Amino acid sequence: MIALLILSLTCSVSTYRLQGFTNAGIVAYKNIQDDNIVFSPFGYSFSMFMSLLPASGNTRIELLKTMDLRKRDLGPAFTELISGLAKLKTSKYTYTDLTYQSFVDNTVCIKPLYYQQYHRFGLYRLNFRRDAVNKINSIVERRSGMSNVVDSNMLDNNTLWAIINTIYFKGTWQYPFDITKTRNASFTNKYGTKTVPMMNVVTKLQGNTITIDDEEYDMVRLPYKDANISMYLAIGDNMTHFTDSITAAKLDYWSFQLGNKVYNLKLPKFSIENKRDIKSIAEMMAPSMFNPDNASFKHMTRDPLYIYKMFQNAKIDVDEQGTVAEASTIMVATARSSPEKLEFNTPFVFIIRHDITGFILFMGKVESP
């Protein structure tokens, strides 16, 4: 049997067809148990979706179920996904870049119809036994600006197909934190209390207290300048319960509940980088595509391909000016208002979301900034 490597690299109102796409990434995130987490649900779901297109048999059935799609909805969902990608526009103050590359070994016979339909999305032929790592890194860096996204541990002599998607986001806050007001402050987690650099801003934001099964959480939306992308922050006593409750539909609902308030917001600066093998997570959703005896990608080739590796590398930096995030399966306050104090001095969840499509570009948890 031939093996396939999927590597997802990361550095919304959803249509009903794409809510399953978003939820697949959320479900994957919920299976990560680290303290500090940065993950790209979009990057994960995009890799799974692009694996669905050539899939057949049980592999296609499982991936359709993962995306909560009926067979007849696959074509329209793909059209909506491509349309949604076009809405992730770069502006003067924000930079959003997503690339997709499918590298197929020269020995694999690709069906002409599949090539005709999907080669424009980044289909490359190469010899995986001849300097494939350098060739792939060169192409990915040229298209995305990210360097060294694959190494020799990710590719081997069994690799005949590698799917790589990258997502890079750099955004400037619409209401930046004043760097002169950043002070050391206490942050308390399950390990105790530590001192962290705490940013501070007084401004009008959208926020509210949301209730989930009698548990209350403070949620606030930090918009990025000149873009339809926001970071949503949530804090409460039981953040595990909050995370377990997240779905694409609930994020839509919660975002509509947020109202304008003047906040004195305090948020720690933080930087998180994760490199993880996510094969076991994907295998829970679509096991047959990892099984040499059951995997089927016959819409692309008659060669017996199966997936044997799946990774995601993700990184995020948040400071006074804004956010830099990448993945390699990611108003003025009125003086008459008394600002509502909201300090993120205990573990919290962050979500970077495209508010037009509902795509969750990045999502994570800060346990120890």
UniProtKB/Swiss-Prot annotation:
<comment type="function">
    <text>Prevents cell to cell fusion via its interaction with A56 protein. The A56-K2 complex associates with components of the entry fusion complex (EFC) presumably to avoid superinfection and syncytium formation.</text>
</comment>
<dbReference type="InterPro" id="IPR023796">
    <property type="entry name" value="Serpin_dom"/>
</dbReference>
<dbReference type="GO" id="GO:0016020">
    <property type="term" value="C:membrane"/>
</dbReference>
<feature type="signal peptide">
    <location>
        <begin position="1"/>
        <end position="15"/>
    </location>
</feature>
<dbReference type="InterPro" id="IPR036186">
    <property type="entry name" value="Serpin_sf"/>
</dbReference>
<dbReference type="GO" id="GO:0020002">
    <property type="term" value="C:host cell plasma membrane"/>
</dbReference>
<keyword id="KW-0646">Protease inhibitor</keyword>
<dbReference type="InterPro" id="IPR042178">
    <property type="entry name" value="Serpin_sf_1"/>
</dbReference>
<keyword id="KW-0722">Serine protease inhibitor</keyword>
<protein>
    <recommendedName>
        <fullName>Superinfection exclusion protein</fullName>
    </recommendedName>
</protein>
<dbReference type="InterPro" id="IPR000215">
    <property type="entry name" value="Serpin_fam"/>
</dbReference>
<keyword id="KW-0732">Signal</keyword>
<keyword id="KW-1043">Host membrane</keyword>
<dbReference type="Pfam" id="PF00079">
    <property type="entry name" value="Serpin"/>
</dbReference>
<keyword id="KW-1032">Host cell membrane</keyword>
<dbReference type="GO" id="GO:0005615">
    <property type="term" value="C:extracellular space"/>
</dbReference>
<dbReference type="GO" id="GO:0055036">
    <property type="term" value="C:virion membrane"/>
</dbReference>
<dbReference type="InterPro" id="IPR042185">
    <property type="entry name" value="Serpin_sf_2"/>
</dbReference>
<keyword id="KW-0472">Membrane</keyword>
<dbReference type="GO" id="GO:0004867">
    <property type="term" value="F:serine-type endopeptidase inhibitor activity"/>
</dbReference>
<comment type="subunit">
    <text>Interacts with A56 protein.</text>
</comment>
<keyword id="KW-0946">Virion</keyword>
<comment type="similarity">
    <text>Belongs to the serpin family. Orthopoxvirus OPG040 subfamily.</text>
</comment>
